[in-house]
Amino acid sequence: MYLHPRERRARHAEARPHSLASSPTRHPDVRAEAVEQGTMRAASSSRDGHATHAHAHPGRRRLRGAGRGCKLEVRNRITRRRFMYTLNPALVPSPSLTDPLPNPRRRPIRLGGVQRRFTTSGAVASPANADADTLPTAPNGQTLMLHNTMKRKKEPFVPRDAEQNKVSMYVCGVTVYDYSHIGHARVYVAFDVLYRQLTRMGYDVTYCRNFTDVDDKIIKRANENGEECDALVDRFIDAFHEDIDALGCVRPTMEPRATDHIGDITALCERLIEKGYAYSADGDVYFSVDALPEYGSLSGRKLEDNRAGERVAVDTRKKNPADFALWKAAKPGEPTWDSPWGAGRPGWHIECSAMIESILGKSIDIHGGGQDLVFPHHENELAQSTASCRCCTEGELGLGGGKTNEGPEEPFVRYWVHNGFVKVDSEKMSKSLGNFFTIREVTERYHPTALRWMLLGTHYRAPINYTQRALEEASDRLYYLYQTLVESKDALVDAQAKDAETAGETKTKPKPKPPTGIAAEGIDLAAETNAAVDSALADDLNTPLAIASLSAPLKTLNDLVSTKKGKKAVGRSVALRDLIAAVETTLESVGLPREGGEGLLEELRELTLRRAGLTRDDVDAAVAARAEARAAKDFAESDRIRDEFGAKGVALMDGGNQVWRPATVVDDK
């Protein structure tokens, strides 16, 4: 009997006993997607009694609840046989170990002749529903998994005041001496999403973001400009608010300035000196890193690295070259405040520790910032705050805390959260390289919402590559999204009017029936979209996956807009209504405008013309010239005009209601 080669390979695989756990290679048809550094074993046999087996390679993701009923179902589409595999609890790490960055392109797997999916008690595995009986949940019943830099892994989020559902979050703000750049945009968009997610999950969040308003850079810039430091600071704080507000970020609960907490800073310095963690020298106060053997636990750096580090300034007054300044003695031309050690000003690191303790308390739930702040800023903050609360040397730094004067042991910060770097055209952003961009420089050419969309398209912990092409694509995607919403809402009004007209023609009131056809499909897709977005954001703020979930409902909405007659139009209004609501809910959850409408589309068109160096009259003239060429059947001229404007980012349309729309510029810069 002749067998197709694929059939022979499938039968050969089924007849050959082989354990998943012992396979060193990756089979092209079967892949274990959920286990990192783990293995899998066969759990059942196929229907014809043959042993179930396949080659597998440890995947890049771990499935939560491993070893507790979590299974991998495999169906061979050629032989029609189903196999079931379970994770080996003895070989799989616990669910709390480090997960890699989420893959925004991960979709239901269909490779070769095999379709597979993970199931946990019949549900798709996700942080929101995996191990629901053991994982802590938020007020809305979900579990938020958050990557903790201190632990180097994702953990279920549990606030200190879980009973009252209160969360305290502190994010390091800007040093206000210049306009904010796209690196700042990355930080504050990321933590705006976290703030929104915590609020959506039902937590009462106190969000604090400071301003460093006394610093060497501020003093230098004020002297260069010939203005007072206070005037410079006020001007750039206003500019910061304008830029960040334009990106759609919610204002924090409070925004303290360092200079408003000088008394708290000097008190903290005194306490550290009394406890033996700091010392004064000629009007300066330094923190002694040798007093804390655990110093470096957050960044993973050792004291030996600091001593040998080339960036450590040599100062003979220091006990250790790595000791850092808590208080700086006064210098001519600098703002100063009185202190027990004479006139001076605070160091950078002590400011955040003092403000956190004064406003939020000795322990907080979340401390955030850019990855560049892990060392030295956050490492030094952790050392200062932990040491100030210790009444002895017991306890571990940041890992359960030391014993405090107020009772139970509690770490300074429960969850350290950091976002990844921003690169420009794959290079480090630097003024010397000429690739340094402020937020307002970018938003003069591109819509702020496009910049936010671009930032959301990369997971917050991953490095992001800023390119002009990425912004072009973000702008194009936004135009498609909001154009679809505008057309869908118009179609919804039309569909509801037709439903009302049909109902008026019916003499007897119809009995309520469950939704069927398009209505049922629309309701289901809307529910699936909402669930997918909730699951993505609960899994360490996976914004790429959340916004990717919009693709299916947007495509369906476009189909519904063009479906106006026949049986397919029955239930159209219900599907439109639910899908529009699902899209708008997703937009709101990641901080994008819920209702952009024609206003946002018009702004996108205006910015396109500005980038292209064109006016409305130029476009109208091109449209007219192209129409004449087409009427004369001069299609070569028509194509030339279209391509000329397309290269500038203006797509001339051949039909429909639109005459032209923004388009992605092909040239990648």
Predicted regions and their residues:
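N-terminal chloroplast transit peptides
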Residues: M1-T25, D29-R105
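N-terminal mitochondrial targeting presequences
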Residues: A42, Q115-L135
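Alpha-helical recognition segments enriched in aromatics with Gly/Pro capping
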Residues: S126-Y177, D192, E242, G263-A491
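Short phosphate-binding/catalytic loops that engage adenosine nucleotides
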Residues: Y203, Y277, V650
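Short, solvent-exposed turn/loop segments enriched in Gly/Ser/Thr/Pro and often Arg
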Residues: Y207-D215, R257-T259, D372-V374
